[in-house]
């Protein structure tokens, strides 16, 4: 869930009353939100960078509020306040209007070259807007929140906002070779080509995350005004020429991207949130977008639509008994203007342009439940009920865990993700032979693949506890993940049991004895007859030559045990011998 940070005093001023922290927490809960943290800029910096860096930072109290991921209208102070005020019935939901300009309409012309990289664009104008420092900061913050959420880190949509008074329309959205694009980007003092900018921004902590979107494309998108001034090179950076400030009065907003629907939603959210500060409140000046095929369309759409939901459906789904009139009132409090029509059981709901999250009747039912209050819904026994039971595999796992602990082994719980090196190089095998599932864009080198064995996690646990008295006897019973083209997701989980013994001597007899105990618990007798188990000499790159055995049970190989190779011990930063056992638990069900 996205988190919105708002200044407490500014929020209370906008709400028209002061709350205690407990009262505001309760209000958030009633509205379907969560007050995650009460902090300050100074406290945040102090936690992350230390007290020295925090010196001089603001002590203004901040509320960090968790917002549902699909409620884009609550990602800024303006939308949050408006939603809460409507919810508390202090104001009515405003009606957003698109108006045509007194003079010539602003045009954004899309050329056919953009089809190869980011084919869609929409635009609008906020006319005669009045910013303060706090309003301006909120405007910038909303764009960043939208970029991180619905825009999918600018991959689907990128937002550009420009001081219209510094530009001259019509505007052209095209795509050119990087070497042909040259302009002065935001916060720079001279002009650079697009190629130079990409190299510069590779070390920029903020912008480097977006470079991959267009970096390897033959053409880069760019927007010009009629004088050839660059507005932006989406999705990377805006031009410095048209930068907006607190004193900006007319804003040209463009949203470019690969998803037309999301681009329209993003534009609607921005203009509805900040048209409140325009001279004519909640009105947005239209802009015309001309597509490569010659057709044109006017934006923003600011479309209102009607939905019909039966009152008895809402009552049934939520588990309440409310009159249609009361249900309509509840929905109106959730920014969904509603009225009872027809036979008295039908509720007509008007969906405003700010509520792009309302897709189906179930979304309307959910809002009715929130407004009614989850704590007010009476708990009842269902008409039919069943007694839950454990999956056989989980039940067997729990039984084994208790008995492994009784055998003197300590349980460890390690990460399901690990580095390629952990499951391949350190164990003496090639990564291609592991059938590992790879993370496409890992955040750290420690979490690159899903583990194919539990052994590395236990060895790393021992390495982190080398100061503990010997011997160290650890076990883990968890899932590993292996590629499997026969499954719908391309991978399959297997429940493994792994145990290690770390001491001044290898202790193979300890691990062997543990295997015998496990088989006894699983009611698998020794010997090949009658579904028994045997161990046979084997070899493995992770084991010492001649000190490895493969375990066969009920006619199939279920795992290996043995003394680990000195190279494996060294690579995991250990200094003493270690024996291990790892088996697949699944075949014993």
Curated annotation (Swiss-Prot):
Disulfide bonds: none annotated. Pfam families: B3_4, B5, PhetRS_B1, tRNA_synthFbeta. Its cofactor is Mg(2+). GO terms for biological process: phenylalanyl-tRNA aminoacylation; protein heterotetramerization; translation. It catalyses: tRNA(Phe) + L-phenylalanine + ATP = L-phenylalanyl-tRNA(Phe) + AMP + diphosphate + H(+). InterPro entries: aa-tRNA-synth_II/BPL/LPL (IPR045864), B3/B4_tRNA-bd (IPR005146), DNA-bd_dom_put_sf (IPR009061), Phe-tRNA-ligase_IIc_bsu (IPR045060), Phe-tRNA-synth_IIc_bsu_arc_euk (IPR004531), Phe-tRNA_synthase-like_B3/B4 (IPR020825), PheRS_beta_core (IPR041616), PhetRS_B1 (IPR040659). PANTHER family: PHENYLALANINE--TRNA LIGASE BETA SUBUNIT, PHENYLALANYL-TRNA SYNTHETASE BETA CHAIN AND LEUCINE-RICH REPEAT-CONTAINING PROTEIN 47. This is Phenylalanine--tRNA ligase beta subunit. It comes from Homo sapiens (Human).
